[in-house]
Regions:
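A residue-level marker of the well-folded mature domains of exported/periplasmic proteins
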Residues: 2-5, 22-315
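Sec-dependent N-terminal signal peptides
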Residues: 6-14
């Protein structure tokens, strides 16, 4: 009797493992390569994110692939529903610019279970399995440090204006700058940085207005984006503390930043290479359309330093 009970227990355990094996993660499979390329973007954008959507759409349709996209309008719950529908519609692949890195996770996991590859870009997703095509944000800070290291005077004093430090891009830009400037120019001192920022020009004005009252010497300003860098320049001008020897560096290569470089005020910015991001995403989609599951994890896209010396290539 004991032997029969033991055999029944083994059979029950085997059944449990077989059932478990029937579901679960199919993220290494491509269940429907003939389906549509689906693109979920967090909000309408005329900048780099809008370019990503428009270029992937144009190239996908140019390749003869069906293409669908959804715009969440800043609503994380709506985006969750949109991506879930893409899973239900059996898309070939889903490209996501997430409104919220936590809220979107259940839909990413559903896509994994359905064998639909997920490609994330620009914004973090905090769970599930996906390929993450992102700028090398750490390199952005390193490029700023490279420029400052080459142009700052001995024993220079600099300040750093952080972006939203809940976002990994802001953290990596700051860490890249801090470590690179220390390694390249140990004589340079970062005398101040804010705890977090909102990426706005007003933030740059506020921080520099405060620091100008505290520090008689500020030789350089590195900012996590161009808007804050331009705000810093405005604050320094208003205080009568801006001149050609002050080095201000930004990130994003927005039109106002390029104009400021042309005017000799902003010394450099860092360009997110949208064309390279699109090229990388299209390469992954080509794999998927051929039935091949792409490599998971981060795919880092290099950034580009823009100064007066190469400005004409990017205006």
């Amino acid at each position: 009797m004991k032997g029969r009970s033991f055999r029944m227990m083994l059979l029950a355990l085997a059944t449990v493992f077989m059932v478990a094996g029937c579901g679960g993660d199919n993220s290494d499979k491509v269940s429907n390569p003939d389906g549509a390329v689906a693109f979920a973007i967090h909000e309408q954008s005329d900048g780099i994110l809008g370019k990503l959507l428009n270029d992937v759409k144009a190239k996908s349709e140019g390749a003869g692939w069906q293409f669908v996209n959804e715009i969440a309008g800043g609503n994380a719950n709506l985006q969750l529903d949109q991506v879930n529908k893409m899973v239900d519609d059996k898309a070939a692949a889903i490209v996501v610019i997430a409104q919220n890195g936590d809220s979107i996770v259940p839909a990413v996991k559903r896509a994994n279970e359905a064998g639909i590859p997920v490609i994330a870009t620009n914004r973090d997703i905090n769970g599930g399995v996906f390929t993450n095509v992102i700028n090398n944000e750490r390199q952005a800070g390193e490029l700023q440090a490279d420029y400052m290291a080459a142009h700052l005077p001995q024993n220079a004093k600099v300040v750093y204006i952080k972006g939203d430090m809940t976002i990994s891009a802001a953290v990596n830009r700051y860490e890249g700058f801090k470590e690179a400037i220390k390694a390249k120019r140990p004589d340079v001192e970062i005398i101040a940085s804010n705890s977090t920022g909102d990426w706005s020009e007003a933030q740059g004005i506020r921080e520099l207005s405060l620091w100008l009252g505290m520090y008689p010497q500020i030789d350089g300003v590195a900012a996590a984006n161009d808007n804050m860098a331009i705000g810093a320049i405005k604050a320094m001008k208003a205080a009568g503390r801006f001149n050609d020897s002050v080095i201000v560096c930004g990130v994003d290569s927005i039109d106002d930043a390029l104009a400021s470089i042309a005017a000799g005020e902003l010394k450099m910015t860092v360009k997110q290479d949208a064309d390279k991001i699109v090229e990388t995403i299209m390469g992954l989609l080509q794999q998927i359309k051929q039935g091949q599951s792409p490599e998971k994890g981060d795919v880092l896209v290099p950034m580009i330093a823009i100064t007066k010396d190469n400005l004409s290539q990017y205006k």
